[in-house]
């Protein structure tokens, strides 16, 4: 496949698909009278499954890459230390903007919060790791020169969150893409990149920023914003 075709495929998958899914609720309301509930995660899982099956059909699926765990201790220290600093900054920013949101989710809906803390890393982060790190690196990264490759990967990861319909989701996830993709590139460890992704995601939900990332019901937004 030539470079132009590979880039077009990248745009269709990482930008065309989220854009189409963005309008699913609107079209469902218009033509069916009701919007589907809790459909984002199933859609993500279907796309991820399609990607994995596509690679398997081409004979290019290496299970060792999908379940790679090894990373030097210094990389774990870097990821955890950086998270501690950025988590403190995110807490301070939310405290300045919406102090009433701080820790509201676990306080007001502890059972739902616990479910999110467990399910988000196991389901959502794992699927996104396959789609936005493993698959992007093996199929599309080489289609972009130099630093454009990292920007393309971060932009793709960010644009997936257009489904949440707010700029904060796009901003946070673009920054996340600039963190998680280099971690995977440096180490080749899906585990470390996914742990880093899960740390930030679970922290955002817990501290109060999760109001910008809920889907399927109003429970999280109500728990955070009151």
PLM ranges: what are they?
Residues 1, 110-114, 128-138, 153-161:
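Short juxtamembrane and helix-loop transition motifs at transmembrane-helix boundaries
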Residues 1-71, 208-226:
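N-terminal, membrane-interfacial amphipathic/helix-forming hydrophobic leader that caps
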Residues 8-12, 76-84, 113-117, 147-155, ...:
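Hydrophobic alpha-helical transmembrane segments
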Residues 12, 16, 41-47, 114-119, ...:
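Membrane-embedded alpha-helical segments of multi-pass membrane proteins
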Residues 62-124, 137, 142-143, 217-219:
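Juxtamembrane helix-loop-helix connectors linking adjacent transmembrane helices
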Residues 86-90, 146-161, 177:
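Small-polar-interrupted transmembrane alpha-helices in polytopic inner-membrane proteins
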Residues 130-152, 185-189:
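Membrane-interface helix/loop boundary segments of multi-pass membrane proteins
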Residues 169-226:
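Functionally important transmembrane alpha-helices
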């Amino acid at each position: 496949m030539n470079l132009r075709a590979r880039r077009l495929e990248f745009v269709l998958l990482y930008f065309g698909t989220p854009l189409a899914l963005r309008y699913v609720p609107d079209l469902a309301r218009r033509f069916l009278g009701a919007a589907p509930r809790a459909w984002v995660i199933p859609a993500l899982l279907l796309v991820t499954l399609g990607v994995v099956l596509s690679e398997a059909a081409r004979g290019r699926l290496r299970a060792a890459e999908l379940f790679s765990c090894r990373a030097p201790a210094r990389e774990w220290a870097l990821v955890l230390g950086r998270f501690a600093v950025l988590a403190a900054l995110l807490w301070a920013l939310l405290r300045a903007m919406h102090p009433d949101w701080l820790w509201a989710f676990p306080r007001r809906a502890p059972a739902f919060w616990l479910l999110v803390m467990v399910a988000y890393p196991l389901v959502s982060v794992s699927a996104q790791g396959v789609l936005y790190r493993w698959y992007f690196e093996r199929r599309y990264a080489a289609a972009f020169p130099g630093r454009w490759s990292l920007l393309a990967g971060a932009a793709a990861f960010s644009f997936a969150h257009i489904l949440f319909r707010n700029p904060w989701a796009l901003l946070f996830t673009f920054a996340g893409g600039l963190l998680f993709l280099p971690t995977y590139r440096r180490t080749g460890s899906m585990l470390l990149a996914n742990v880093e992704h899960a740390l930030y995601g679970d922290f955002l939900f817990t501290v109060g920023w999760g109001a910008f990332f809920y889907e399927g019901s109003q429970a999280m937004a109500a728990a955070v914003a009151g």
